[in-house]
């Protein structure tokens, strides 16, 4: 049977079906359950509305909170895949990539393709009928390439593969993959949901029977569960998600416009710009361009390192860091930082060029960030 048939899809659900009181807190606690309900409402409010319209008291989506995003992905892979299956993934987070490749020792094949090319996804699915799970990020990191989630869902549905969307880069404010046909949605809560870099966390949302029955034994046995304190921190900070992301997106657009006209910048990648290659797709599935942008500085690796050296000083408003989603602006140079150990040919194949710089825009004033970017570029 297919992964979809093996795991099933329920018709009725509730976001917080937990074991009775008195059991170990690893199996659930009120603080974590509160965060589950909040994320459920953010990602699946359209399901709630539909249920209310037909006088149903129980929606169809369940949520579970993890100690990290990788805890969520690892537990998901163990629960969904078995020997002989394959995972089809795009250009994903490095640890996700490593995890999927590492599953080969258990007989699970990792297959990779360009998720921004629907025809390539279809060809990969046809070539690997044993795909149990399609896992994608949209936008991808750090290239910001967008996957057409709805089109891909039309490919996975008849083939019995589960479509999993890592919605970390967007958060529920900017994108709701369930509306577009995703079966499961995951988050690294560490990023935009927390928004303050104060906690690590992960989340997985999906059909209730899968989340609370088939999947729950893996959740409790793998043990990648959060502490109540981390759930409390994330439950507090998520309340400001909408105003934070709205402001961050607006600031990112201003910065992208500035960089687009700068003589030392070869190109700018920002989904909110009208000339972004996939602008039509962005308008269909995202609220705005988001808080992440990239730009290619002329001069290659040395120019990128010069910009990093400027922001490595303590008197600048940006922090040299590889994380994202904080109210503080983070800047990083993939070729000399996150992807320095990746062979240059592999970096180029992934769209990571020598002068590529990634910005995760925070809540500082746009004029301050633009001023310091200008100063940094003057040094290249």
What is the predicted function of each stretch?
Residues 45-55, 85, 94, 102, ...:
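PLP-dependent enzyme catalytic core of the Aspartate aminotransferase-like
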Residues 2-3, 206-210, 297-300:
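Short loop segments at secondary-structure junctions
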Residues 49-264, 269:
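Conserved PLP-enzyme active-site core in the AAT-like
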Residues 42, 237, 296-300:
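A structural micro-motif recognizing beta-strand termini
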Residues 3-71, 75, 95-103:
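Conserved N-terminal alpha-helix of the aminotransferase class I/II PLP-enzyme fold
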Residues 155, 254, 258-262, 306, ...:
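Generic non-transmembrane alpha-helical segments
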Residues 1-19, 210-215, 318-340:
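Mobile, glycine-enriched helix-loop/loop "lid" segments at the mouths of ligand-binding/catalytic clefts
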Residues 267-357, 361:
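Conserved C-terminal alpha-helix-loop-beta "cap" of PLP-dependent enzymes
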């Amino acid at each position: 049977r297919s992964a979809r048939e093996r795991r099933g899809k329920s018709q009725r659900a509730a976001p917080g079906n937990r074991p009775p009181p008195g059991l170990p807190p690893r199996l659930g606690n009120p603080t974590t359950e509160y965060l589950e309900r909040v994320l459920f409402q953010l990602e699946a409010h359209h399901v709630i509305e539909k249920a209310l319209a037909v006088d149903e008291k129980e929606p169809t989506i369940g949520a579970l909170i993890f100690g990290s995003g990788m805890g969520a992905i690892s537990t998901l892979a163990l629960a969904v895949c078995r020997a002989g299956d394959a995972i089809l993934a795009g250009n994903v987070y490095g640890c996700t990539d490593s995890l999927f490749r590492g599953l080969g020792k258990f007989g699970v094949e990792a297959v990779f393709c360009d998720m921004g090319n629907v025809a390539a996804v279809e060809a990969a699915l046809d070539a690997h009928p044993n795909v149990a799970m399609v896992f994608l990020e949209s936008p991808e990191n750090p290239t910001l390439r967008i996957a057409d989630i709805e089109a891909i869902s039309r490919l996975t549905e008849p083939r019995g593969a589960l479509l999993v969307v890592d919605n970390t880069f967007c958060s529920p404010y900017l994108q709701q993959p369930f509306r577009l046909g995703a079966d499961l949605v995951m988050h690294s809560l560490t990023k935009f949901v927390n928004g303050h870099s104060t906690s690590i966390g992960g989340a997985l949302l999906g059909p209730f029977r899968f989340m609370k029955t088939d999947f729950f034994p893996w959740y409790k046995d793998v043990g990648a569960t959060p502490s109540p304190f981390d759930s409390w921190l994330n439950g507090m900070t998520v309340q400001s998600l909408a105003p934070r992301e709205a402001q961050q997106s607006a600031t990112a657009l201003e910065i992208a416009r500035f960089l687009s006209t700068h003589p030392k910048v070869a190109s700018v990648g920002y989904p909110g710009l009208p000339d972004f290659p996939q602008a039509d797709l962005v308008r269909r599935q995202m609220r705005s361009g988001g808080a992440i942008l990239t730009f290619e500085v002329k001069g290659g690796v040395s120019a990128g390192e010069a910009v990093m050296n400027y922001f490595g000083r303590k008197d600048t408003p940006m922090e040299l860091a590889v994380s994202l989603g904080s109210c503080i602006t983070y800047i990083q140079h993939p070729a000399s930082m996150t992807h320095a150990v990746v062979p240059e040919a592999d970096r180029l194949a992934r769209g990571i060029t020598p002068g590529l710089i990634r910005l995760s825009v925070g809540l500082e004033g746009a004029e301050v960030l633009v001023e310091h970017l200008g100063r940094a570029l003057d040094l290249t």
